[in-house]
Amino acid sequence: MSWLKEVIGTEKAIIAMCHMQAMPGDPGYDGQKGMDWVIKKMYDDLIALQNGGVDSVMFSNEFSLPYMTKVDTITVASMATAIGELKRYIKIPFGVNVLWDGEKTLDLAKACGADFVREIYSGVYASDFGMWNTDFGRVARHRKSIDAGNVKLIFNILPEGC
């Protein structure tokens, strides 16, 4: 049995994206609207996606622009807070993606109980934010050190924007 069938329940899963708005620490964060607004937008998307019949959902900091390869702690803390607030409403398997930090993605998955992650885990790239070495050896060791072996890894083979 494939991990998709095991974790999500089907071999051809529809994994929908729940793109998080800019959060504390991001240049585009709206402090007047605050995290309550970010969480409300996520809630609305989550409910719409689940009601639409998707098999799974993945939370990503899509609006943490410009992206970084070593994400600040405030980003992961904000994502964990938001996902924690929504956890009781999540009725389908879920994953996370902290753009573009493989270690922090695993940290978030472990902290919030995600079933899987998606990240760029292989290769070296030139991008709009400079040279980027994914250093999967470090990520694999980190995964072991935080006991996240049960978290499934989805590899992006070629990152968009490179």
Where are these regions (language model features)?
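Conserved anion-binding
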Residues: 20-23, 104, 108-162
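A short, N-terminal amphipathic alpha-helix
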Residues: 41-53, 85-88
